[in-house]
């Protein structure tokens, strides 16, 4: 493909993408395929001779689209949103065209410097404490990670290195292995599974702190665990506080947990993967109060801030905590400015070496939407979730299972887990809408997350009517089953 054909095909692809997104409401949200459907439809080996663009596009509709779950359908209410916007897509095209691998300032100065500035822009939108911003001479700063899972792992590994070096400096005879076997990290029992995975990868034990009646980690439960473990000769070193849990969007009490971490000298990492986007709205900023106690903070613009995947924003108060843990300088990566103190080499802030020019997406989206446009988008989703909550509360067969704060509603039929499992199965089998469940205190709960950029109140109302219809069918079947047993 030469430049001339690329121009033509590029325009065709833009039309295809625009048509797909404009018509996505008409596509079934969840596919009608079985595991392994695709392999028989594709040759077992790559073609020896070039194929045409037309043939590939034809196969997209014939082979790929039938197996796609349409995350951007206005009838997709599962998981949490994955962001998408036209400005972000255009920026991603440019990122692919430039094709730099920005592991150091010298590898692509614009890639590095735009990321630093965009992370400061975003930090100011969130009203983060000044200590988290790079500024012109700050000790902190932001970095784009691939996912919140990566950010948590990076924070844990940096904290592990920091505490190990501190203990060895005080007692040089201590071996790293002896320290490692005593290290303990903590998170709420509602924390994301990636926190547990970080502990597994980091080789440290992770303890779940029981959450309160609102599914939040509180000071008393954390303090009790710390005292018990210290008395047993263990070494607490790392705490993850979650703002907006995956199960029910609950919020750990940062204003209680933060001071304890500060007093105990524990690294506090704040994971706000979903909820963090909402903090750009003044009315939701209070949910971030206490972040001043954190050593690191992370959220995903690629969830709810119209910047498509992958773009996970992470800030640290002391960049040397990261660079001290991950810095390696082989000859082939060195450059003349690396020790000048004037530049950032982001390879020392992350696990991989390579990195894409992801800040372009942020730059395009922030400029083309403006802060007010992004705030309006967040507020619309929150309004729709409360509209759905109101519909649920009007039907006495159902109950709300957790406080509705942002764009997620947790609800269920009053009754057994088996009944609610049957309801979810019937909803997803019909494939008009798509939901996923969670477990709250051993209760099977349905999650209704406002996800699509194009979702409107009418879609929410239609979804609720469908849920009611499925509920009536399930309840009727349950009644018939009970009648048969009785007879």
UniProtKB/Swiss-Prot annotation:
What are the boundaries of the region 2 X approximate tandem repeats?
A: 58-178
> Which positions in this protein are listed as binding substrate?
82, 192
Reactions catalysed according to its record: L-dopa + H(+) = dopamine + CO2; 5-hydroxy-L-tryptophan + H(+) = serotonin + CO2
What are the N6-(pyridoxal phosphate)lysine sites (modified residues) in this protein? 303
Q: Which GO terms describe its molecular function?
A: 5-hydroxy-L-tryptophan decarboxylase activity; aromatic-L-amino-acid decarboxylase activity; L-dopa decarboxylase activity; pyridoxal phosphate binding
Question: What cofactor is needed?
Answer: pyridoxal 5'-phosphate
Q: What is this protein called?
A: Aromatic-L-amino-acid decarboxylase
Q: Which InterPro entries match?
A: Aromatic_deC (IPR010977), PyrdxlP-dep_de-COase (IPR002129), PyrdxlP-dep_Trfase (IPR015424), PyrdxlP-dep_Trfase_major (IPR015421), PyrdxlP-dep_Trfase_small (IPR015422), Pyridoxal-P_BS (IPR021115)
Give the gene name: DDC
Q: How does it assemble?
A: Homodimer.
Q: In which pathway does it act?
A: Catecholamine biosynthesis; dopamine biosynthesis; dopamine from L-tyrosine: step 2/2
Annotated signal sequence is none
Stated family: Belongs to the group II decarboxylase family.
Q: Name one GO cellular component term.
A: cytoplasm
Q: Where does pyridoxal 5'-phosphate bind?
A: 148-149, 246, 300
EC number(s): the record gives: 4.1.1.28
Record the organism: Bos taurus
């Amino acid at each position: 493909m030469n430049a001339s054909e690329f121009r033509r095909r590029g325009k065709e692809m833009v039309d295809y993408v625009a048509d797909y997104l404009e018509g996505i409401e008409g596509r079934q949200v969840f596919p009608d395929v079985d595991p392994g459907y695709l392999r028989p439809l594709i040759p077992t080996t790559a073609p020896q001779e070039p194929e045409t663009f037309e043939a590939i596009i034809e196969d997209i509709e014939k082979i790929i689209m039938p197996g796609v779950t349409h995350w951007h359908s206005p009838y997709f209410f599962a998981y949490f949103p994955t962001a998408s916007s036209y400005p972000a897509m255009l920026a991603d095209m440019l990122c692919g065209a430039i094709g730099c691998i920005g592991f150091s300032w010298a590898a692509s100065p614009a890639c590095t410097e735009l990321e630093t500035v965009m992370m400061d822009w975003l930090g100011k939108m969130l009203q983060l404490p000044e200590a988290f911003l790079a500024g012109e001479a700050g000790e902190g700063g932001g970095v784009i990670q691939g996912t919140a899972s990566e950010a948590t792992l990076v924070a844990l590994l940096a904290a592990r290195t920091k505490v190990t070096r501190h203990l060895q400096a005080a007692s040089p005879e201590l071996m790293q292995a002896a320290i490692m076997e005593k290290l303990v990290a903590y998170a709420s029992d509602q924390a994301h599974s990636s926190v547990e995975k970080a502990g597994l990868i980091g080789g440290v034990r992770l303890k779940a702190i029981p959450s309160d009646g609102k599914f939040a980690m509180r000071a008393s439960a954390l303090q009790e665990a710390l005292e018990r473990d210290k008395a047993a000769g263990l070494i607490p070193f790392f705490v993850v506080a979650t703002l907006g849990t995956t199960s029910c969007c609950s919020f750990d009490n940062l204003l209680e947990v933060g001071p304890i971490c500060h007093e105990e000298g524990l690294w506090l990492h704040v994971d706000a993967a979903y909820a963090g986007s909402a903090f750009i709205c003044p009315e939701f900023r209070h949910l971030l109060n206490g972040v001043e106690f954190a050593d690191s903070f992370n959220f995903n613009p690629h969830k709810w801030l119209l910047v498509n995947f992958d773009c996970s924003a992470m800030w640290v108060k002391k960049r040397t905590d990261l660079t001290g843990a991950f810095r390696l300088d082989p000859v082939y990566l060195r450059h003349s400015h690396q020790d000048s103190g004037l530049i950032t080499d982001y390879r020392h802030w992350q696990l991989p070496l390579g990195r894409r020019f992801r800040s372009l997406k942020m730059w395009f989206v922030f400029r083309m939407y403006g802060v007010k446009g992004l705030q309006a988008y967040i507020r619309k989703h929150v309004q729709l979730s409360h509209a759905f909550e109101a519909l649920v509360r009007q039907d006495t067969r159902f109950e709300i299972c957790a406080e509705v704060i942002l764009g997620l509603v947790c609800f269920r039929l009053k009754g057994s887990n088996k009944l609610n499992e049957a309801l979810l199965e019937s909803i997803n089998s019909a494939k008009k809408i798509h939901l996923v469940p969670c477990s709250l205190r051993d209760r099977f709960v349905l999650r209704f997350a406002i996800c699509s950029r194009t979702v409107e109140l009418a879609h929410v109302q239609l979804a609720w009517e469908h849920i009611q219809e499925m509920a009536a069918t399930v309840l009727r079947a349950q009644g018939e089953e009970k009648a048969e047993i009785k007879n």
